[in-house]
């Protein structure tokens, strides 16, 4: 029995070293997921506010998952150093839950990436029709038009069918140079053509969102499958320690 323990001790030490390294990398991925989630919310938040509410889950899932991973990454290091079989099993169980959560995040990002065009066309058109220049959705429209240098859905003439145009003309956020735009110019589509951005926001926004949601989904899928390695290491180490009644000092 003693000789068997001596033979398995190097294996356990090797598994312990690998799992500590993995747990540290796991902790780093948690920080990355948290950062990507916050970045997605802050960078894409204005654009997402124009989309249906059920499409806003991916950044929050990443933030929540990233925060939890940071905590359990530290727990994994502690469990490995202690050499506690039940802690290692709990760690492996958590990794399996993280694996499923990240798959959900990745799938939601992938689905959102392919559904965005129809959803954005409908909601952005609705936001233009109800534009008043003051509410949250109106400010979101202004932000999109200013930041992407675009105007309207397909082009600036789309504004002529909105109630806002009758009283105020095209919104100043469409102007190439707002100091060079005046209300009279914005009421006249012919004159406005020389003052406002010509490109519509639809193609620019959908391209921007598809690219960045693809990044979020790709990161989630990549990190999710890395959890399988940690699950295998934690289960193997727990099994070796239990079978050989090995205690780490």
Swiss-Prot record:
Its main location: membrane. GO terms for biological process: regulation of postsynaptic neurotransmitter receptor internalization. Residues 1-16, 76-86, 235-249 are cytoplasmic. Pfam families: Tetraspanin. Residues 41-56, 113-213 are extracellular. GO terms for cellular component: membrane; postsynapse. InterPro entries: Tetraspanin/Peripherin (IPR018499), Tetraspanin_animals (IPR000301), Tetraspanin_CS (IPR018503), Tetraspanin_EC2_sf (IPR008952), TSN6/7_LEL (IPR048232). It is found in: Membrane. Glycans are attached at residues 54, 155, 158, 177, 188. It comes from the Eukaryota. Keywords: Glycoprotein, Membrane, Transmembrane, Transmembrane helix. It is a multi-pass membrane protein. The chain crosses the membrane at residues 17-40, 57-75, 87-112, 214-234. May be involved in cell proliferation and cell motility. Belongs to the tetraspanin (TM4SF) family. PANTHER family: TETRASPANIN, TETRASPANIN-7. This is Tetraspanin-7. It comes from Mus musculus.
């Amino acid at each position: 029995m003693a000789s068997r323990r001596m033979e398995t001790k190097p294996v356990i030490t090797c598994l312990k070293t690998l799992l500590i390294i993995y747990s540290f990398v796991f902790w780093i991925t948690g920080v990355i997921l948290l950062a990507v989630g916050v970045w997605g919310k802050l960078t894409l938040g204005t654009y997402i506010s124009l989309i249906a509410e059920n499409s806003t889950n991916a950044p929050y899932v990443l933030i929540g998952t990233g925060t939890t991973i940071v905590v359990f990454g530290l727990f994994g290091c502690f469990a490995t150093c202690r050499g506690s079989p039940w802690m290692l099993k709990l760690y492996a169980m958590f990794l399996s839950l993280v694996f499923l959560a990240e798959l959900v995040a990745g799938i939601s990002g992938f689905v959102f990436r392919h559904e965005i065009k129809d959803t954005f066309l409908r909601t952005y058109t609705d936001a233009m029709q109800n534009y008043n220049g003051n509410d949250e959705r109106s400010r979101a429209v202004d932000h999109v038009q200013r930041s992407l240098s675009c105007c309207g859905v397909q082009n600036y003439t789309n504004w002529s069918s909105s109630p806002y145009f009758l009283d105020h003309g095209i919104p100043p956020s469409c102007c190439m140079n707002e100091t060079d735009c005046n209300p009279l110019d914005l009421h006249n589509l012919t004159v406005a053509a020389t003052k406002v951005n010509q490109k519509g926001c639809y193609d620019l926004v959908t391209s921007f969102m598809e690219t960045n949601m693809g990044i979020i989904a790709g990161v989630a899928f990549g990190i999710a499958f890395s959890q399988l390695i940690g699950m295998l290491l934690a289960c193997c180490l727990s099994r070796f320690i239990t079978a050989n009644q090995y205690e780490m000092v």
